[in-house]
Structure formats: C-alpha cells, structure tokens
UniProtKB/Swiss-Prot annotation:
Gene behind the chain: proA
One Gene Ontology MF term: NADP binding
Residues forming coiled coils: none
SUPFAM superfamilies: ALDH-like
GO biological process: L-proline biosynthetic process
Major location (coarse): cytoplasm
PROSITE patterns assigned: PROA
Catalytic activity reported: L-glutamate 5-semialdehyde + phosphate + NADP(+) = L-glutamyl 5-phosphate + NADPH + H(+)
Species the sequence originates in: Ralstonia nicotianae (strain ATCC BAA-1114 / GMI1000) (Ralstonia solanacearum)
UniProt-recorded name of the protein: Gamma-glutamyl phosphate reductase
Amino acid sequence: MKQFDVNEYMALVGRQARAASRGMARAGTAQKNRALLHLAAAIRRDAARLKDVNARDVERARANGQDAAFIDRLTLTDRAIETMAAGLEQIAALPDPIGEISNVKFRPTGIQVGQMRVPLGVIGIIYESRPNVTVDAAALCIKSGNATILRGGSEAIESNGALAALIEEGLADAGLPATAVQVVATPDRAAVGKLITMTEYVDVIVPRGGKSLIARLMEEARVPMIKHLDGICHVYIDVDADIDKAVRICDNAKTQRYAPCNTMETLLVAREVAARALTPLARIYQDKGVELRVCPDTRATLEAAGFSGLKDATEADWHTEYLAPILSIRTVDGVDAAIEHINTYGSAHTDSIVTENYSTGMRFLREVDSASVMINASTRFADGFEYGLGAEIGISNDKLHARGPVGLEGLTSLKYVVFGHGEIRT
C-alpha cells in the first residue's frame, strides 16, 4: 500500500480548488444563495447527528486535558447549531458584491473606465477548535464567489468532516463545483506548512487563531495573508470628556467580555480629569475583579482616593494583549501624549477617544494609525456585524488590501473595465 504523502494530497486539493474557483467566479447570486439555504436546512435536519459526532471530538479533547474554555469553543450545542444555520440565512440575504461596477468615468478620448468587483480566487483559511468557523468561512467564500480550502484544528476533525459533507451537499444542490469548499481531511500539521506555500494554487491565507499560530504563519508563509497578530486596544479619556459617558464606555470596553481582540487593554486618562474619571472606574473594575496595573501618577491618584491592591505597570504591560481581567492604566498630559502612546505601543487594531471637543476628536481620527478609530464609543463595536457587514471572516490590522473587519467585500478585489466605441489610442 502506498504511504500517504501529505504534499501530494495538498497539491491535489490546491489543483481542485483552482479549477473550482473558475466555476465559482461564474456563479450567479441565486445559485450561491441556493447552496447557502440548502446548507442551513441540512444543518437543522442533521442537528442530532452533528452533536453525536461532535461529542466524540469533545471526549477526546477532555481526555487530552484541554481546559474548559477550549471545550466550550469546541462544543456544538443546540444554540450553536441554530446560530450556524441562521448565519447562513443572513449571508444569503446580503447583497452580492460580485460583478458590481463602480467609479465609472468618461475620459476625453471617449472611453469609459470603471472598476468591477471580482472574487480573489482561492482562499485558504486556517483556524483552531471552533467547528462553527467551518460553516461561517465556507458561507462567506461561497457568497463572494471564491473557492476555499479549510484547515481546522485536529481536535475538531470529526465535526469538521461531518460539516464538510453537508457543505458538499449544498454545493451539489445548487450545481456548484463540488471542490469549491474543501476541508483538509488530515490532522498532519505538515498540511498547514504546505498550504501556506502553495502560491500557484492559493491567492490568500486567512488565519484565525491564537498569537502563536499567527506568528508561525507570518514567519513561514509565502502566500499573502489577511490577519492581525494582537488586539492591544486603547480608550483615551480626554480633558473635554463627559465623565459619565467615559465611565460607561470604559466599563463596557473592558468588562463586557475579556477574550475578544477588540477588548480594551490600556486606558489612557488626561491628567486634568484623572481623579474624576478614575475614581468611579477603579471602583467598577475592582468590584468586577479586574487587576489594575498602573503608572506612578495613576497610583498616586487612586491611593489618594482610598484604593489599594494596585500593581505597578511595567514597560511590557503597554505592549501586552491580556485577554483577561487585567487592565493597564496611564495618566497622560493630553491628546498629544495619548496619540504618541497609542502609535508607539498599540497594535493598529482599534482605539477610541472620549471627548466633547470636535476638533480634538477629528485630530484623533486622523492621527491614530489603526484599522478602526472611534469617538465616544466602546472598542467592542469593532466587529463586522456591528459595522453592518453582516458577517466577518476576521479582522485585519494590515494596511494592504483589507483593513478592519473583513466581510464579503474584503474577500474580493477590483479590476478595471473599459467600455469603448471603437476608440484607438493616438
């Protein structure tokens, strides 16, 4: 018996994806929507079987000592299954960006020049223990006219296999290429190494996972990536802030959820309002069990107000994405210092200012070099659904191609189209 060769297998997957991408680029909106709606119905129909298959993945993960948070991400509950199905219906209802022509201009020569939105081609998506990503990613790629290669975590291999079969069923029902969505069927990590170097077959890689995964892919990939490494998000309370508004925003930005990449990790406060802003906020944070790591000026302000249990912030804290109930706080001399801090220590993800001063707010928008910059809003709004994109495949803090939450348009590109009437260049 011939030994399994992961490189040969991945090359086959790549060739099949490239061939399927041509059919996907030609697919009409009704055809793509039919595949999504069939998949939604199939997921609801097979919910019990999906839970049984998923239970085996969960049992293995527990036996391997995975923690409760990991098990929670891996588990397909009734609610998670319904969320997947409903998400498919929402994506089907979104406008189809493919074929849209914009920016049409008449040139003095008589030609008309515009831009048409087209699929990227083949998208490789690498993710960890969430089976729902298999469906979400497949749906966005189908709707945007792309073929996709999905490589989920080995811990979810049976769940992903069951979902892959349903995706193939939906593609077949709509008359779309069967290999438009392929789920890598081997747990061999070498498959990831091959996927991220197949420039002849794969147009872009979208990684979704922890910092160690993203860092490894950044180092080894030859295929371009849409990604973000860190979510070191800031809120700056300006000298002209409405303090009640600032307290609400900063409470939500830190404590609504600790793990998402759009959670605030560093709070900056203008010196003139430090006592008024930090006293109520520190009370809220300590009541909720948030550890406060503070600069010397912040410590002096809070200790004068009777607070204890504070930790000294180190240089490393300003660079840290905690993803936990920990917050670093710095008192600054104003908006200049706040912008300087953010552009020095931030990760170009999401940053917000609380101010009633229009000029200061607009300056913050212009000068903070991040994918999302906000005035008087929680960083937790940095999300594709909240931005009206309907769904997102991830968030990018890069500057090329997609930036910020990546929805359907982020999985497309623009090509120039020219309409002539027999003109020739002289």
